[in-house]
């Protein structure tokens, strides 16, 4: 399982460019890239609006948008790499990638704080794993015993109710639902009987 730091490193600094999905063609990537450019121009035009510019900037700086831009950059790099040198590895990064890297710094700070808290929690949990396992086992056994007692007392109460409620035939045992329905009808009949004037 990857920690947050490893995930961020894998996301922002992959060992090699990710493979292009088979269902996406070059035209699709070009359309996505044009859409990204249009969004960048629309955000730069709307930055004069004051409050709207802040919300748009935060919207376009989300990790999903950055991931899409990274995928587009990786696809471009793969195309240039395959055209220029089909056997070597791609070592460079486009300038747009580094611009997006600087825009994503708030997420880096968030991920480092989250990863430090998860690493401290994992270290404390690994030290108390032996002791915690026994405690959890005892708690689980106690909870199972309580649930068994509760179900037994509930079944006993239904058995007593079946003995009191008149049923149509004694050839089969009434289900819990049928027992409750019969008890409701029986109580209703008793109430009407008691409310009569003699």
Curated annotation (Swiss-Prot):
Keyword Zinc tagged: no
Domain bHLH: 138-190
Domain of life: Eukaryota
UniProt-listed SUPFAM superfamilies: HLH, helix-loop-helix DNA-binding domain
Chain positions covered by the region annotation Disordered: 76-131
GO biological process terms, semicolon-separated: axon development; dendrite morphogenesis; neuron fate commitment; positive regulation of transcription by RNA polymerase II; sensory organ boundary specification; sensory organ development; sensory organ precursor cell fate determination
Tissue distribution: During embryonic development, expression is seen in a small cluster of ectodermal cells during stage 10 which becomes restricted to 1 cell by stage 11. Expression is lost from this cell in the thorax and then the abdomen. Later expression is restricted to sensory organ precursors. Very transient expression was detected in distal leg disks at approximately 0-4 hours after puparium formation (APF), correlating with the anlage of the innervated tarsal claw.
GO cellular component labels: nucleus
Protein location: Nucleus
Record Gene3D superfamilies: Helix-loop-helix DNA-binding domain
Major place of residence: nucleus
Keyword annotations: Developmental protein, Differentiation, Neurogenesis, Nucleus, Transcription, Transcription regulation
Stretches with biased composition (Low complexity): 111-129
Function: Transcription factor involved in early neurogenesis; sensillum basiconica formation and maybe sensillum trichodea development. Promotes multiple dendritic (MD) neuron formation. Required for olfactory sensilla; regulated by lozenge (lz).
PANTHER family, sorted: BASIC HELIX-LOOP-HELIX PROTEIN NEUROGENIN-RELATED, TRANSCRIPTION FACTOR ATOH7
Protein's UniProt name: Basic helix-loop-helix transcription factor amos
